[in-house]
């Protein structure tokens, strides 16, 4: 779809209702209150299908409402805060770490966790939460039946036995992705973005900029959400505890950054929270360590006053030595946080990689790389404090958690940025063969989103998002964040045809030897009516083409010959006269040469990825969506198109363009037609 832009300081968009029956949270609650029943969600039933998709539950779970687990259930006790979040049996610590960070952003929290719900007179067993998904805010409704074992919650829960907002939040997020199991394994950044609509950045601590502490401090001051983790070298190391009390492969949230005076020197400290709340750092600056006795009392009282169980301080240099990754989620202009000193300009567009047409793979696959979706980015104004343009480009694949139950997981994705020539549409293979990228994602990786920050001179750029390997399908969203307004345009989006009027056929006494031979064959087949039917045309063309050894094919089908007659039969007799056939044969010879230019191995087939070039050479320009449909219609399982299907495709397209052009008398690109006209046109293609 076309690229969209988000203006600075735009109002927060309204969340879309997601229930299959179209009802909103308020409508469901009101209906249940009137009928005096508790809501049971038909879209996410309280059974094993909501828990696991790949196996049977390891335990006998019972689904119970909060009122069955305690005497005085509350949605939120006091204020929602990071101590309300305790990990359960599910491996979704990444979600817990993001939720802990969310509690520090009260206005964002109020959006994700609306406070218009409680266990009071308005209680009807229904709750709702709001998440950002692929450039839209969604309102997700759930009932309050939660999985338990022996009357205890087994998934995410609060430290307070009668508080349930965090458990219900996890259930709503599981519903969004199809099941609780779909939440196993992930990046803190993924949930941070879903809670804010923000854009993520990732830093490797061992190779981070020297000003990483300043970058993180400014990010926290701007209400950004942050997380960190320690890499693992094998699955056996996952959740393994180090001697210093840190857990590998575990998602932590970053909740504070401070500088303190210690024995006359400035020490940079970072506060980190473990969602488990039990295992903590035991090195320097840990709880009760000797370093705190050497800090100014005012600093110590101020810093330690708000630390909780599972939350610890460490020196920033120790942090960089022990942790491997830092994730920062920057907030977008429509965030609910006010008075932040920096706002982004945002452009975005959606697309997909489809086998046989737009799933070209990375630059390693040069023959198909150019077929990937392309879009042009124009940067005109430099940053206020520099002569370059700062941009963050984020490529996100869509709905992959939801598709896990169908055997699909994250694709390995990345992107490249090229300097774009002026006034050029979709760029072809030779451009990428001879021109290197100006910027690119650091690596291809199988995560939901890959993002990079660049500083580029003003100019025109081409962004090419890809999967690592060709023929891999996925839907994607690209967001471009720039300090100054940028313009973006999808390449290859034009649909047009340059089809000159067919030449006048030569008179009989001016016919070439080839035409005289075709006339003799035509006369043998046509009989007294001097015209041939589709079946006679099939016989004639198969006979003529079989003598051309360079064209390898199994014969034209009757369907193809009907399409040829529909294109060339100007007097609507359902047959071809020889003068009409001569005009067609001139077209046919050009189409044959075009096909052979792509059938380099003379197999009788061409790659469906090259259909865009072939059709453009024949005078027809299609966008990616139409090329995807043609690939699905005419290509085989190896993404090849044989000669008969190629001919059918090109004949039908030319016929459709010519019919449209005859109806578009004002050359406006639009036609109005009634059902009769539409059916007549469809039948004649």
PLM region descriptions:
Residues 596:
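Inter-heme linker and motif-flanking segments adjacent to c-type heme-binding CXXCH motifs
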Residues 600:
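Short, conserved catalytic or interaction motifs in soluble domains
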Residues 577, 607:
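Extracytoplasmic Gram-positive cell-surface binding/anchoring modules and repeats
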Residues 603:
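A contiguous pocket-lining binding segment that forms or flanks enzyme active sites
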Residues 1-563, 570-572, 578-582, 586-593, ...:
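Structured alpha-helical subdomains that flank or immediately precede key functional sites
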């Amino acid at each position: 779809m076309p690229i969209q832009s988000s203006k600075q300081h735009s109002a927060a968009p309204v969340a879309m209702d997601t229930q299959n029956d179209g009802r909103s949270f308020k409508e469901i609650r009101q209906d249940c209150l009137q009928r005096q029943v508790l809501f049971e969600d038909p879209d996410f039933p309280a059974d094993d299908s909501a828990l696991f998709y790949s196996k049977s539950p390891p335990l006998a779970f019972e689904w119970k409402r909060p009122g069955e687990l305690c005497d005085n259930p509350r949605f939120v006790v006091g204020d929602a805060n990071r101590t309300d979040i305790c990990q359960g049996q599910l491996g979704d610590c990444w979600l817990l770490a993001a939720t802990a960070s969310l509690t520090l952003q009260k206005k964002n929290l109020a959006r994700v966790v609306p406070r218009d719900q409680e266990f009071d007179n308005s209680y009807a067993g229904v709750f709702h939460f709001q998440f950002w998904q692929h450039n839209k805010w969604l309102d997700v409704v759930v009932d309050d039946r939660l999985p338990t074992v022996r009357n205890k919650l087994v998934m995410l829960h609060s430290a307070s036995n009668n508080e349930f907002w965090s458990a219900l939040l996890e259930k709503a997020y599981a519903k969004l992705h199809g099941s609780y199991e779909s939440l196993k394994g992930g990046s803190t950044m993924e949930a941070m973005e879903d809670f804010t609509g923000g854009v993520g950045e990732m830093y490797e601590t061992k190779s981070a900029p020297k000003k990483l502490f300043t970058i993180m401090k400014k990010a926290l001051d701007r209400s950004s959400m942050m997380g960190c983790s320690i890499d693992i070298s094998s699955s056996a190391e996952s959740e393994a505890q180090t001697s210093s009390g840190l857990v590998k492969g575990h998602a932590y949230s970053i909740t504070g950054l401070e500088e303190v005076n210690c024995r006359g020197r400035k020490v940079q400290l970072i506060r980190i929270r473990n969602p488990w709340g039990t295992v903590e750092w035991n090195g320097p600056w840990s709880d009760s360590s000797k370093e705190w006795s050497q800090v100014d009392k005012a600093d110590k009282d101020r810093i330690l006053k708000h630390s909780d169980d599972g939350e610890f301080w460490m020196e920033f240099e120790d942090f960089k030595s022990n942790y491997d990754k830092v994730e920062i989620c920057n907030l977008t202009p429509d965030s609910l946080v006010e008075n932040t000193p920096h706002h982004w300009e945002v452009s975005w567009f959606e697309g997909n990689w489809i086998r046989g047409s737009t799933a070209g793979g990375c630059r390693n696959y040069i023959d198909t790389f150019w077929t990937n979706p392309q879009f042009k980015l124009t940067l005109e104004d430099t940053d206020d404090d520099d002569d370059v343009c700062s941009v963050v480009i984020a490529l996100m694949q869509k709905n992959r958690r939801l598709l896990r139950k169908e055997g699909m997981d994250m694709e390995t994705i990345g992107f490249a940025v090229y300097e774009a020539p002026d006034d050029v549409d979709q760029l072809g293979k030779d451009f990428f063969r001879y021109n290197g990228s100006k910027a690119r994602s650091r690596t291809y990786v199988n995560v939901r989103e890959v993002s990079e920050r660049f500083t580029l001179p003003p100019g025109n750029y081409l962004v090419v998002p890809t999967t690592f390997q060709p023929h891999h399908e996925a839907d994607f969203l690209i967001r471009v964040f720039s300090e100054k307004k940028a313009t973006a345009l999808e390449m290859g989006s034009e649909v047009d045809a340059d089809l000159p009027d067919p030449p006048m056929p030569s008179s009989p006494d001016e016919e070439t030897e080839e035409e005289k031979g075709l006339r003799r064959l035509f006369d043998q087949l046509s009989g007294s009516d001097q015209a041939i039917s589709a079946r006679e045309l099939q016989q004639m063309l198969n006979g003529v083409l079989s003598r051309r050894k360079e064209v390898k094919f199994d014969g034209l089908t009757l369907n193809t010959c009907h399409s040829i007659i529909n294109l060339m039969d100007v007097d609507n007799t359902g047959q071809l006269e020889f003068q009409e056939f001569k005009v067609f044969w001139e077209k046919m010879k050009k189409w044959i040469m075009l096909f052979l230019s792509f059938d380099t191995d003379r197999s009788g087939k061409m790659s469906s990825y090259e259909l865009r070039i072939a059709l453009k050479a024949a005078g027809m320009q299609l966008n990616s969506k139409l090329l995807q449909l043609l690939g699905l219609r005419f290509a085989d399982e190896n993404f090849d198109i044989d000669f008969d299907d190629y001919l059918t495709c090109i004949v039908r397209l030319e016929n459709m363009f010519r019919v449209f052009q005859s109806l578009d008398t004002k050359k406006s690109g639009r036609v109005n037609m009634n059902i009769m006209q539409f059916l007549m046109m469809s039948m004649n293609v």
